[in-house]
């Protein structure tokens, strides 16, 4: 029982640090299905980062997400949902990612509520952050003003 409590405290710290990293990078955290709908139904472009506690999220996806806030062309909104934590919000966001299997970490670029492109876990895990950045830059160039 003691080990389980220690593990839970450790995981809570990991989750809080992962959340904090995204918020400090300038992403709005969506924690409810209602918040997801409110943002994703808006006109304009939105980058959704599906956050997670796995190593490729911390070592690749979150650094790429932070970097993209400084790119010349940007979506209107940068938001994040947290897979495995805010389960209902994440499930609702994934309803907008038509044609893509659930994957975390991942990035989805939407325009006027419609999915335009996705960077899935298999395109993140085992890759360098710059490779993820390049995919996102290409999408921003194509879909963002």
From Swiss-Prot:
Single GO BP term: cell redox homeostasis
Protein name: Bacilliredoxin BH2759
Coiled-coil ranges (or none): none
InterPro entries according to UniProt: BrxB/BrxA (IPR009474)
Protein family according to the UniProt entry: Belongs to the bacilliredoxin family.
């Amino acid at each position: 029982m003691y080990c389980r409590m220690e593990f839970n405290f450790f995981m809570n710290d990991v989750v809080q640090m992962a959340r904090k990293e995204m918020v400090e990078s300038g992403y709005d955290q969506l924690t409810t299905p209602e918040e997801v709908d409110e943002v994703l139904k808006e006109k304009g472009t939105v980058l959704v980062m599906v956050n997670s506690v796995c190593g490729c999220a911390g070592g690749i996806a979150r650094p790429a997400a932070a970097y993209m806030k400084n790119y010349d062309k940007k979506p209107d909104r940068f938001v994040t949902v947290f897979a495995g934590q805010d389960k209902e919000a994440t499930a609702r966001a994934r309803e907008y990612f038509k044609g893509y299997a659930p994957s975390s970490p991942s990035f989805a670029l939407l325009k006027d509520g419609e999915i335009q492109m996705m960077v899935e876990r298999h395109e993140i895990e085992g890759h360098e952050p710059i490779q993820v950045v390049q995919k996102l830059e290409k999408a921003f160039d194509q879909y963002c003003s």
